[in-house]
From Swiss-Prot:
UniProt-annotated binding residues for Mg(2+): N8, E385
Induction: Activated by RamA and repressed by RamB and GlxR.
Protein name: Acetate kinase
Pfam families, per database record: Acetate_kinase
Function of the protein: Catalyzes the formation of acetyl phosphate from acetate and ATP. Can also catalyze the reverse reaction.
Gene (UniProt): ackA
Assembly behavior: Homodimer.
Family: Belongs to the acetokinase family.
CC per GO annotation: cytoplasm
Highest taxon of the lineage: Bacteria
């Protein structure tokens, strides 16, 4: 069985999967795992092999040790690189800037180009590079492929991609809308076309990727024409801990009147805002319980969250001119039926009508949740970014 190894390397963790690229979107990966608490004394590796879970708790000094320990654990259970045919390694890279519009075969030169983009993604790209460096040393004889979160949005028209600031400053510092979650938005927009069995160019779709991080995209005939995240993943929708869109003047106000540093404001907007900043929690199951108990902070957070979803929905309906499908995906989008219901409530005049019974069904693969009479077909489609990355990677094998 030919498999692709998919790596998502974070600052203190590595998520990985061994994926059969021929799988369907809802098939479980052959192996999945998580290396966490890298650099901490309480490091842990969790491995899931065909439904069975195995755990190793040990200090993990760095990414190199973490990935080597994970491979050793896989070898112990007869599913390591030495026992299986790994044909390619796909790496999720958060920011490709304007340099990368498609997956790239990784070379030393490509690694340096990704490293040069660290100022655009200081929280993500350094860890992505660490994962690439480690994996290339452990598996030097298979192709390694970088798949960029931003790549799908290279098709944005200038009116959607550029900010109205001094063009020379923007050009010098790479300031523009890049968009994120691109692999997910592309995956589900392609899936809905497959489900409908229609030509890609005939379908206009609005995609909701709603997890702890959240974004939306307008996809016209297979090409992204707008998206909610911007130069960074902080922009756009209200998220679990991120503020989403705010008046930029708030940054100056906090600096001048509260004496907050840039790093403190960065931390506030990225980690202490959003639904958590408003309600104290960022888990939508907890938020729902608080709403059911009539917690006013939870109600306020939820209403602001839904308001922002509907603002972007209306904007993208205008941008596309004609909407054929709407797709919800990711943790909240796939599982929170109340979010889907409230995001699309009262839009029957625009041809959008949710079927309450279909919407209430459990998350079990792609499904239609709109009524038969709805002109716009609304779907829940589980995303599978790892499968998408695996399919890209094996093309270079």
């Amino acid at each position: 069985m030919a498999l692709a190894l998919v790596l998502n390397s974070g600052s203190s963790s590595i998520k990985f999967q061994l994926v059969n690229p021929e799988n369907s979107a809802i098939d479980e990966p052959y192996v999945s795992g998580l290396v966490e608490q890298i650099g901490e004394p309480n490091g842990r590796i969790v491995l899931k092999i065909e439904g069975e879970k195995y755990t190793l708790e040990t200090p993990i000094a760095d990414h190199s040790e973490g990935l080597n320990l994970a491979f050793d654990l896989m070898d112990q259970h007869n599913c390591g690189p030495s026992q299986l045919e790994i044909t390619a390694v796909g790496h999720r890279v958060v920011h490709g800037g304007i340099l990368f519009s498609a997956p790239e075969l990784i070379t030393d030169e490509i690694v340096e180009m990704i490293r040069d983009l660290i100022p655009l993604a200081p929280l993500h790209n350094p860890a992505n590079v660490d994962g690439i460096d480690v994996a290339r040393k452990i598996l030097p004889d298979v192709p390694h492929v970088a798949v960029f979160d931003t790549g799908f949005f290279h098709s944005l028209p200038p009116a959607a991609a550029l900010y109205a600031i001094n063009k020379d400053v923007a050009a010098e510092h790479g300031i523009r809308r890049y968009g994120f979650h691109g692999t997910s938005h592309e995956f589900v927009s392609k899936r809905v076309v497959e489900i409908l069995e229609k030509p890609t160019e005939d379908i206009n779709t609005i995609t909701f990727h709603l997890g702890n991080g959240a974004s939306m995209a307008a996809v016209q005939g297979g090409r992204a024409v707008d998206t909610s995240m911007g130069m960074t993943p902080l922009a756009g929708l209200v998220m679990g801990t991120r503020s989403g869109d705010i008046d930029p003047g708030i940054v100056f106000h906090l600096s001048r009147t509260a004496g907050m540093s840039i790093d403190e404001i960065d931390n506030l907007l990225n980690k202490k805002s959003g639904v958590k900043g408003l309600s104290g929690v960022n888990d939508f199951r907890e938020l729902r319980e608080m709403i059911d108990n009539n917690d006013q902070d939870a109600w306020s957070a939820y209403n602001i969250y839904i308001h922002q979803l509907r603002r972007y929905l209306g904007s993208y309906m205008v941008a596309l001119g004609r909407v054929d499908t709407i797709v919800f995906t990711a943790g909240v989008g796939e599982n929170a039926q109340f979010v889907r219901e409230d995001a699309l409530a009262g839009l029957e005049m625009y041809g959008i009508e949710i079927d309450p019974e279909r919407n209430a069904l459990p998350n079990d693969g792609p499904r239609l949740i709109s009524t038969d009479a709805s002109k716009v077909k609304v779907f829940v489609i589980p995303t599978n970014e790892e499968l998408a990355i695996a399919r890209y990677a094996v093309k270079f094998a």
